[in-house]
């Protein structure tokens, strides 16, 4: 349509010029009348300008294709189109700000994504929600001998984040936040369960950064650089994370690993997609999430730094199946051995060496088994560290103060997937804690039975689980909804719905 309008415009200019010529000739003027040749020259100049405008307005091949499609859709048999439809199609074609074919979006492999056609830029947003109802029964909790029962709903996790790659598939990134579920006022109790005071705590519902890292693969090599806030390369259960395991991590993972073992640092990774992969580097310490650069004791930071490393050996199976603590969806039998180490140090000689040895089996038949030994050696014990999303704090005065201590623990889990939906599971744990308040029963045993139902894989999963601690536990483990119940039995019942988009 732009070409047609240019012709009309040119003809109009010529008509005006020719019509004005007699009038100009008749009017008295001191200027000499233009000759016929001069008029022809003016017409030629106007034609040149019109030709230039036509060239600038010429639609691109993509626009011509779009106009052609619009015409065919209007009358596919005759190829004719009404003037208004032609005007609309031409306007739509010329109003394109950019070629939409350069970006694609959709849903694949149970993930939403936005990416460039060449795959160099990818954004995958995600949301992870766990809605939980928990009942805790602490036997003979009160001095009168009565039980204490607590029940209620909680949004155990409400996490959002995104991951993908930038500039090249070799440069990947990951960032996510979780909402804090704590109250603004935290009640403090002693080993006997009596309230001794209150302290402030981050307000529930506020976002807390969990991970924010970048990873670069040196092209066509097995070497990677990994920097930012990430999982400490120590404990496999915590590296897997909350999306692909039981409703909550084991007590050893929560207490010894500080709930998902988030830290800040830089590591080097060797991964040639073969049977062995290694990650190791420097960190700010095992409990250094969301802290600044300052050392202890400035800013309440408990650790000055550390080094960490993990080695994994795959005997058989696919590595992707090792990223979950279940055999759900396994196409091949999986067997992997792993071991991790973390040495974290702080001012005043408070140093800590944590280590894990684990093995995971996941059969294509649905059978799953996992065993992990987690030990912790502490020099000049300051008290057992409390779990939390920001740095670390320590329990009240302990008989182990300034002593060198060692704490062993073992976690064993089995599960079996039935008909690709049902999955009964069981877990046994034993921990020996040090650095707890005076009078504590430090031998902790955890027996758990549960059942998963996969509506749509991990994306929509329902879980019911019952936990029994026959001798209780001398500290709170808020992450798993286990409350302090020193020397007395405790039952914990929970149901949970997981939504992962």
Model-derived segments and spans:
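Bacterial N-terminal signal peptides that target proteins for export
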Residues: 1-12
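Bacterial N-terminal signal peptides
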Residues: 10-20
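N-terminal periplasmic/intermembrane-space "pro-region" immediately following the signal or transit peptide
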Residues: 22-130, 138-142, 275, 501
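Outer membrane beta-barrel
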Residues: 100, 107-288, 301-319, 323-331, ...
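Outer-membrane beta-barrel pore domains
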Residues: 146, 191-202, 329-501
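Active-site rim elements
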Residues: 200-201, 255, 293-298, 341-344
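Interfacial loop-to-helix transition and helix-capping segments at the boundaries
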Residues: 298-302, 350-352
């Amino acid at each position: 349509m732009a070409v047609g309008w240019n012709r009309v415009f040119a003809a109009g200019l010529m008509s005006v010029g020719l019509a004005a010529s007699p009038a100009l000739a008749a009017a008295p003027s001191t200027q000499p009348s233009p000759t016929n040749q001069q008029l022809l020259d003016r017409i030629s100049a106007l034609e040149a300008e019109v030709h230039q405008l036509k060239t600038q307005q010429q639609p691109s091949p993509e626009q011509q294709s779009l106009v052609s499609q619009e015409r065919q859709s209007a009358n596919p048999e005759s190829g004719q189109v009404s003037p208004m439809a032609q005007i609309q199609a031409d306007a739509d074609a010329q109003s394109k700000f950019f070629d939409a074919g350069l970006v694609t979006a959709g849903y694949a492999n149970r993930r939403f994504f936005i990416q460039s056609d060449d795959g160099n830029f990818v954004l995958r947003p995600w949301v992870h929600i766990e809605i939980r109802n928990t009942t805790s029964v602490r036997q003979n909790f009160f001095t009168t001998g009565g039980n204490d029962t607590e029940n209620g709903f909680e949004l155990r996790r409400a996490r959002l984040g995104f991951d993908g790659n930038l500039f090249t598939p070799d440069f990947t990134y990951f960032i996510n936040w979780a909402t804090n579920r704590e109250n603004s006022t935290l009640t403090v109790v002693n080993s006997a369960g009596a309230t001794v005071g209150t302290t402030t705590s981050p307000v529930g519902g506020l976002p807390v950064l969990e991970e924010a890292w970048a990873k670069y693969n040196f092209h066509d090599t097995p070497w990677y650089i990994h920097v930012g806030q990430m999982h400490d390369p120590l404990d496999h259960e915590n590296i897997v994370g909350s999306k692909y395991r039981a409703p909550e991590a084991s007590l050893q993972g929560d207490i010894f690993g500080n709930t998902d073992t988030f830290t800040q640092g830089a590591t080097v990774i060797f991964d040639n997609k073969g049977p062995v992969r290694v990650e190791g580097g420097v960190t700010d310490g095992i409990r250094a999430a969301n802290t600044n650069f300052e050392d202890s004791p400035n800013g309440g930071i408990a650790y000055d730094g550390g080094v960490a490393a993990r080695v994994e050996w795959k005997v058989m199976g696919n590595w992707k199946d090792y990223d979950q603590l279940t055999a759900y969806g396994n196409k091949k039998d999986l067997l992997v051995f792993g071991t991790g180490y973390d040495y974290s140090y702080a001012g005043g000689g408070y140093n800590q060496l944590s280590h894990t040895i684990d093995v995971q089996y996941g059969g294509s038949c649905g059978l799953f088994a996992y065993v992990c030994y987690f030990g912790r050696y502490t020099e000049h014990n300051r008290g057992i560290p409390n779990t939390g999303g920001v740095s670390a704090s320590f329990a009240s005065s302990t008989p182990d103060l300034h002593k060198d201590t060692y704490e062993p623990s073992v976690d064993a889990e089995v599960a079996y997937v039935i008909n690709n939906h049902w999955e009964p599971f069981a877990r046994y744990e034993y921990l020996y804690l040090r650095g707890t308040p005076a009078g504590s029963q430090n031998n902790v045993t955890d027996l758990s039975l549960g059942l998963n139902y996969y509506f749509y894989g991990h994306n929509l999963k329902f879980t019911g689980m019952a936990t029994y601690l026959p001798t209780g536990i001398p500290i709170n483990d808020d992450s798993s909804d286990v409350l302090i119940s020193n020397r007395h039995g405790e039952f914990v019942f929970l149901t949970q719905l997981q939504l992962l988009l």
